[in-house]
């Protein structure tokens, strides 16, 4: 969990693929338009960019608003219930557009689509499309099918939430805006950590990493288009390649990747998110102060300062181990900017557990901490702990403390 945004953002597309004036659309009324709204983390933003690119390559253009769109897609988040409820409410409101345009196509993409699948058709009457996290490369094809069905007066529900080998290698195209100097690059998909509170292994699948050479070529292409700063994305990004690639001369695959990107001419800054404390090995810590392009910033989710809660969460480290990691990185990089994620109100969290977290936050002096109230996610181990649930008013109090 990496500081995900609670609200959704509509995707801004560059002129080469998206924006067209009203005069242009009036002159070419046959060009279908699409409105794509994104909820959640940076990985969702990157996925939406890939979807937008595939739609633009197929002849779609960006709609200036939902009301003007022939196709409306919501790329969803499932990390917390609030994010799902926002997307569901949004879609319910969007259905009213059918009064003026009965042919408008409505679809869910991403994590909630993956988690709920076909059941969304029962929840949301009139839904055309549900596409999961391993099928983003099929969105344009399925949208075409849904539009044809609507136009012919025989609308039908289309869903694809299956697993697909190699899907991690399909998120590689970009739609850059004019003078855009930053970009996200997805290096892996999925997570095998199975923290007790987290739905990501269900919605994103098993860990799969892209080849180093393929990532380097993508970054070179971005730099050739004016990008100066790249952020590498992965659910546990610093564990990149541990299933597919060997450790070489004591260097883990992620460090090997960073070293190769350090060599890319024209790239000025390199970031990554979100790492896991268990992946902060000595070789990665050593990159701070050694690799000139690696930004002096680390977002490292701690989740709790209580050893008891960390064990229940299945995090695989203690509060002191976390402290030692930060001390080592700060020793290498004294000016390091440090941010984190914290969950309060986890099932069974006592006042003493919360105070341990509070003390850790005070001691470390993070530049920023994203504090989240625990949100039960169906299918996780923590969701079964109803007997030890923390009252909502206590969660809120700790969240606001």
Where are the model-predicted features located?
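Conserved strand-turn element in the central/C-terminal portion of the radical SAM core barrel
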Residues: 194, 198-205, 269-278, 304-314, ...
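Proteins enriched for Cys/Gly/acidic motifs involved in redox and nucleic-acid/cofactor modification
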Residues: 30-241, 253, 283, 288, ...
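Short glycine/threonine-rich loop-to-helix capping motif typified by GTGT followed
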Residues: 244-248, 285, 348-356
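Radical SAM/AdoMet-radical enzyme domain recognition
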Residues: 255, 263-264, 269, 281-340
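Aromatic (phenylalanine/tyrosine) cluster motif
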Residues: 17-19, 24-30
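Charged/polar low-complexity intrinsically disordered segments
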Residues: 4-5
